[in-house]
Amino acid sequence: MTAETERIGVKGGMEYSFGFTKIDEAQKQSMVDGVFHSVAENYDKMNDILSLGLHRTWKNSMVAWLSPPALSNWKVLDVAGGTGDIAFRILNASRKKAHATVLDINSSMLSVGKKRAQKNGLAPLTDFVEANAEHLPFEDQSFDAYTIAFGIRNVPHINQALREAFRVLKPGGRFLCLEFSNVEMPLLNKIYDLWSFHVIPKLGQFIADNGDAYRYLVESIRKFPKQDDFSHMLNHAGFSRVSYRNLTGAIAALHSAWKI
């Protein structure tokens, strides 16, 4: 176990930071909520900016690795998934047989998702729940899969959210997380840092009139645990068969784990 793992994976750490700014633990959730209320209508544009448009390919890879079955009794919980982007991809991959529950703490994000579900004819297959990832309002062993994309780094107490994920999964259930990660190629890292810290906040100001929100999102990526450290956190929460796949030079990573 590395010192970084000990700091973040066991004792916590991100609950005391808002990007690179140190804050009181009680402030974190409300500050993150403010960011996502402000970017909800432009969320896909935000991910396009943060990922150079690659998030769509990464999300397709996530759903392909999940490989949802075309079964009406198969249930997925998509956490921090308010706009429905991941849930809708999963439902379409299941030939519109599965059922998705989209959970988000942010009402503005959920509002966008509900409109999209109606527009795409997926409302009958989708429930939207406003709740906290750290305190899921579901019984034990309720879901076959738990997904979260670009959301776990915004949860104040990540370890608690992982314990809740483990609790609500059925035995044999799958955890799958897509998150920005620690770039492993030196040249790419320099280019991505230049893009992240010097270009993205300016684009955020121009496109969404909110450079500060985009600056937080960039900084939160840098504060998130490295791939191996996050794997340790999943093991610590009780998961087995933990693994990850780096995407595009590790700009992002897909983390997989099972409840055995």
From Swiss-Prot:
Stored InterPro entries: SAM-dependent_MTases_sf, UbiE/COQ5_MeTrFase, UbiE/COQ5_MeTrFase_CS
Record protein name field: Ubiquinone/menaquinone biosynthesis C-methyltransferase UbiE
PROSITE patterns from the UniProt entry: SAM_MT_UBIE (PS51608), UBIE_1 (PS01183), UBIE_2 (PS01184)
GO biological process: aerobic respiration; menaquinone biosynthetic process; methylation
Gene: ubiE
Reaction equation(s) it catalyzes: a 2-demethylmenaquinol + S-adenosyl-L-methionine = a menaquinol + S-adenosyl-L-homocysteine + H(+); a 2-methoxy-6-(all-trans-polyprenyl)benzene-1,4-diol + S-adenosyl-L-methionine = a 5-methoxy-2-methyl-3-(all-trans-polyprenyl)benzene-1,4-diol + S-adenosyl-L-homocysteine + H(+)
SUPFAM superfamilies from the UniProt entry: S-adenosyl-L-methionine-dependent methyltransferases
Protein family membership: Belongs to the class I-like SAM-binding methyltransferase superfamily. MenG/UbiE family.
ATP-binding is among the record's keywords: no
Organism this protein belongs to: Bartonella quintana (strain Toulouse)
Annotated S-adenosyl-L-methionine binding sites: 83, 104, 132-133
Enzyme Commission code(s) on record: 2.1.1.163, 2.1.1.201
Lineage: superkingdom: Bacteria
Pathway annotation from the record: Quinol/quinone metabolism; menaquinone biosynthesis; menaquinol from 1,4-dihydroxy-2-naphthoate: step 2/2; Cofactor biosynthesis; ubiquinone biosynthesis
Sorted UniProt keywords: Menaquinone biosynthesis, Methyltransferase, S-adenosyl-L-methionine, Transferase, Ubiquinone biosynthesis
Purpose: Methyltransferase required for the conversion of demethylmenaquinol (DMKH2) to menaquinol (MKH2) and the conversion of 2-polyprenyl-6-methoxy-1,4-benzoquinol (DDMQH2) to 2-polyprenyl-3-methyl-6-methoxy-1,4-benzoquinol (DMQH2).
Molecular-function annotations in GO: 2-methoxy-6-polyprenyl-1,4-benzoquinol methyltransferase activity; demethylmenaquinone methyltransferase activity
Annotated Gene3D superfamilies: Vaccinia Virus protein VP39
